[in-house]
Amino acid sequence: MDSIETHAKQLGRQTPLPASPEEAQLDRVPNPHADTDYLARFTVPEFTSLCPVTGQPDFATLVIDYVPDRWLVESKSLKLYLAAFRNHGAFHEDCTVGIGRRLADLLEPRWLRIGGYWYPRGGIPIDVFWQTGEPLKSVWLPDQGVAPYRGRG
């Protein structure tokens, strides 16, 4: 199996924030349990991007679940990739689905889903969900744990 250092180019180094998601480098590392079906979850409670029309900030909680195959996403590179969206203008759907697709292309997981729970803009919350296919029956798949937006009261 390859060493982690072969694949994790940013780990253990001072790494500047990428200027854009397109410029961000996502790293993957070998999965030491590739023979086992299990779920890995990343919860991102303070995701930000910009409205592509007004330039105003948008906020979301992202929940990324995946059943890895040969590869795991290296978490520092994921953090830097997601942080690069804070000055990136895109609609909620584009951010959410684009992140899911980029991770799926990189990792080639057995299964992946992303839930984007966006705070209201113009009085309307937008929740966006994307997945690669049917979830595996052999894996415990907990609820994403983000309640629907109810406003105040």
Curated annotation (Swiss-Prot):
Phosphoprotein listed as a keyword: no
Listed Gene3D superfamilies: 3.30.1130.10
Annotated binding of substrate, by residue: 73-75, 92-93
GO terms of molecular function: preQ1 synthase activity
Disulfide bridge map: none
Involved pathway(s): tRNA modification; tRNA-queuosine biosynthesis
UniProt keyword annotation of NADP present: yes
An individual GO BP term: queuosine biosynthetic process
SUPFAM superfamilies xref list: Tetrahydrobiopterin biosynthesis enzymes-like
Subcellular localization, as worded in the UniProt entry: Cytoplasm
Uppermost EC category: oxidoreductase
PANTHER family the record matches: NADPH-DEPENDENT 7-CYANO-7-DEAZAGUANINE REDUCTASE
Protein name per UniProt: NADPH-dependent 7-cyano-7-deazaguanine reductase
Gene name of the record: queF
